[in-house]
A protein has these predicted regions:
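Basic, polar low-complexity surface loops/patches
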Residues: 1-201
Length: 201
């Protein structure tokens, strides 16, 4: 296998910082996705999957969207519950010495959508955060698109789960230590990993 190109090395280094997000990586007039992000992006966005070095052992799956249509595609991914990291060129390619400097300038998550175009009409867009001590759950619900904020305390896992399901969150925030709680597996069955963001304890 040939060594990775400098651009792919740069992509992988940036992607390693955002492993739970689909990385939109700016290359000229396009945002490109590579490797697993490309396969997922192609499938979820119904766009062509191609590859660099097509037909060779070291081919790299890729797909892309024009930069001026990126918002539409990001919106589709958010509606499907994905996070998107937007990586832009942060220096003029004409002035770059070597590889163009790139960095993530924004991370989009399903629970933090404020653009009414990205939201369905009449539906809440709840971001839910919670903590737990024993069998007592503290819950906070935030809809950033309307400014609505509510909080409550609930005893028992079933009551907690029922309240979370009733509010249909787009994203859930939890401390990593919840993964060691006896209720974790039951919670994960209902929400999977894509919807939950784990924060450092």
């Amino acid at each position: 296998m040939k060594p990775l190109t400098p651009v792919i090395k740069q992509y992988l280094q940036i992607k390693s910082q955002y492993p739970d997000a689909i990385l939109f990586f700016r290359m000229g007039d396009f945002y490109e996705m590579f490797f697993e992000d490309a396969r997922l992006g192609s499938r979820e966005l119904d766009i062509a999957l191609t590859s660099r070095n097509k037909g060779q052992k070291d081919s790299v799956p890729l797909c892309g969207v024009p930069y001026f249509t990126a918002e539409t595609y990001i919106s589709k991914l958010l509606q499907k519950g994905y996070k998107v990291a937007l990586c832009d060129q942060v220096e003029d390619p004409k002035l770059a010495k070597g590889i163009v400097k790139r960095e993530v300038v924004r991370v989009f998550t399903p629970g933090l959508v404020i653009d009414t175009i990205q939201l369905g009409t009449g539906e809440n867009n709840y971001l839910i955060g919670f903590s737990v001590e024993g069998e007592v759950f503290g819950l906070a619900f935030l809809d950033i698109s309307t400014g609505e904020l509510k909080a409550c305390q609930i005893s028992g896992f079933e009551a907690f789960l029922s309240e979370v399901l009733r509010n249909e969150p787009k994203e859930i925030l939890s401390l990593k230590r919840f993964q060691e709680h006896p209720c974790y597996e039951g919670f994960k069955k209902n929400f999977g990993n894509g919807l939950i963001t784990y924060l450092d304890n």
